[in-house]
Amino acid sequence: MFGLGGQELVLILLIVLLLFGAQKLPELAKGLGKGIKEFKKAQNEIEEEFNKATDDSSSKEKKETKA
């Protein structure tokens, strides 16, 4: 995962804990999870639009070559 080992992840978590406090961590994790979910949703929508566009253009080319 991004070239980080276990020790690096623990260190990052400790720093986050010190900066934000234990009470804010669940709220931060929830916000991060929502952000990742929205990012993946947008990524999937872009991929679907790209696939539709490439499928449409390839089907038009096939129709033109048949005519």
From Swiss-Prot:
One of its GO terms (cellular component) is TAT protein transport complex. GO terms for molecular function: protein transmembrane transporter activity. Keywords: Cell inner membrane, Cell membrane, Membrane, Protein transport, Translocation, Transmembrane, Transmembrane helix, Transport. Coiled coil: none annotated. It comes from the Bacteria. InterPro entries: TatA/B/E (IPR003369), TatA/E (IPR006312). Belongs to the TatA/E family. This is Sec-independent protein translocase protein TatA. The lineage of its organism: Bacteria, Pseudomonadati, Chlorobiota, Chlorobiia, Chlorobiales.
